[in-house]
C-alpha cells in the first residue's frame, strides 16, 4: 500500500509541478477521494459524480481515485465501485489506488483478491495504468 501511496503522491507532485510551468498548459485534474461511503450507502451519488466527469471529459485531463473504494472489502461494494469507475472507460483517462479500507476489516492481512477480481490487471495494463 505504501508503494501505491508513493505513486499517487509522485503523480500529484508531477502534475502540480508541470501545471506551474509557464510553458505548460493548465492540467485539469478531478480527484475522487474516499468513495467508500458512497459505494456502501449512496451509489447514486457516486454514479452522478462519475457521470459528471464523463460529461465534462473534454475539459478534464485526468481523474484520480485516491483509494478507499470500499468500506468493508465486500463484493457488493466492489461491484458498485467497479461499475461506477468503469463508466469512464474510453471516455476520460483515470487511475486508482487501493486504500486501507479496500484490504478488509483487518488490513494487516492485506486481502486484495476482490480488488483483483473487479479491476483485473489484464484490463488496466493495456491502458498503461
Describe the function of each predicted region.
Residues 1-9:
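Bacterial N-terminal signal peptides that target proteins for export
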Residues 3, 55, 116-117:
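Polar/charged alpha-helical tracts
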Residues 9-17:
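Bacterial N-terminal signal peptides
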Residues 20-78:
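N-terminal active-site segment of His-dependent metallophosphoesterases
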Residues 75-129:
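Extended active-site neighborhood of metal-dependent phosphoesterases/phosphodiesterases
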Amino acid at each position: 500500500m505504501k508503494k501505491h501511496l508513493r505513486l499517487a503522491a509522485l503523480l500529484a507532485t508531477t502534475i502540480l509541478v508541470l501545471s506551474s510551468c509557464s510553458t505548460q498548459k493548465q492540467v485539469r485534474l478531478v480527484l475522487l477521494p474516499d468513495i467508500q461511503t458512497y459505494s456502501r450507502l449512496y451509489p447514486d451519488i457516486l454514479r452522478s459524480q462519475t457521470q459528471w466527469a464523463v460529461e465534462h471529459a473534454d475539459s478534464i485531463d485526468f481523474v484520480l481515485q485516491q483509494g478507499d473504494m470500499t468500506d468493508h472489502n465486500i463484493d457488493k461494494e466492489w461491484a458498485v465501485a467497479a461499475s461506477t469507475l468503469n463508466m469512464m472507460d474510453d471516455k476520460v483517462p483515470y487511475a486508482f489506488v487501493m486504500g486501507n479500507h479496500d484490504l478488509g476489516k483487518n488490513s494487516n492481512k492485506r486481502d486484495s483478491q476482490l480488488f483483483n477480481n473487479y479491476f483485473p490487471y489484464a484490463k488496466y495494463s493495456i491502458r498503461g495504468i
